[in-house]
């Protein structure tokens, strides 16, 4: 997320999260945005409901197979796609009743690399937690969400370590949530 803002000297980061802070060369400090957000409720919308998921096997030309319906988020290599590696494409839609400001989509637990697309716009790629994507303001109405998750080759290849070490899960385990603030009416 790129935004200009004044800092109060405290920077809170989630585990594995990083942030680049750029200071003005002049040393000038701009006043903070003093908008009162205390009257705006923070909204958390669970979007872990039914998804479709399709697989593009590793080494393919990124052609995805027929989408399968998922009633719940789970380890895909333990259930729907055992013993495979590649890219899993998740799709779902959700509806917002009101306009929201400062929204973030949090994918919860993901294994391994996730790229998020909202309403046709790619919002970025994450390689480790937190799997959070700033979406900016969202308008009321229907929204389309797609997540491409790439797992690792250890799901398709057996080796001596696989006998004693468990293989990590694959895919989005969730919960997937949309966090935001209601805009004042």
Go through each PLM region and give its residues:
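Short strand-edge motifs at loop-to-beta-strand transitions and within beta-strands
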Residues: 7-9, 19, 88-92, 129-133
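C-terminal beta-strand-rich structural cap/linker in extracellular carbohydrate-active enzymes
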Residues: 9-31
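Short, flexible loop/turn segments at beta-strand junctions in immunoglobulin-like
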Residues: 10-13, 135-139
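An acidic-aromatic loop/edge-strand motif
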Residues: 28-88, 138-185
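Aromatic-lined ligand-binding clefts that engage carbohydrates, nucleic acids, or primary amines
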Residues: 94-96, 100-119, 126-127, 145-149
């Amino acid at each position: 997320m790129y935004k200009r803002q004044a800092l109060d000297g405290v920077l809170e980061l989630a585990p594995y999260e990083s942030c680049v802070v750029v200071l003005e060369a002049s040393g000038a400090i701009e006043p903070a945005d003093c908008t009162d957000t205390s009257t705006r409720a923070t909204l958390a919308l669970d979007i872990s409901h039914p998804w479709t998921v399709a697989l593009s096997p590793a080494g393919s030309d990124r052609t995805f197979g027929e989408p399968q319906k998922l009633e719940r988020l789970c380890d895909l290599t333990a259930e729907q796609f055992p013993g495979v590696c590649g890219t899993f494409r998740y799709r779902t839609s959700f509806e917002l009743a009101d306009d929201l400001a400062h929204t973030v989509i949090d994918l919860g637990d993901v294994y391994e690399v996730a790229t998020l697309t909202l309403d046709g716009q790619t919002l970025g790629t994450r390689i480790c937690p937190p799997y959070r994507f700033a979406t900016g303001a969202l308008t009321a109405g229907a929204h389309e969400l797609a997540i491409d998750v790439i797992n690792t080759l250890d799901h398709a290849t057996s080796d001596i370590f696989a006998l004693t070490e468990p293989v990590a899960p694959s895919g989005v385990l969730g919960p997937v949530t949309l966090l935001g603030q209601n805009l004042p009416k």
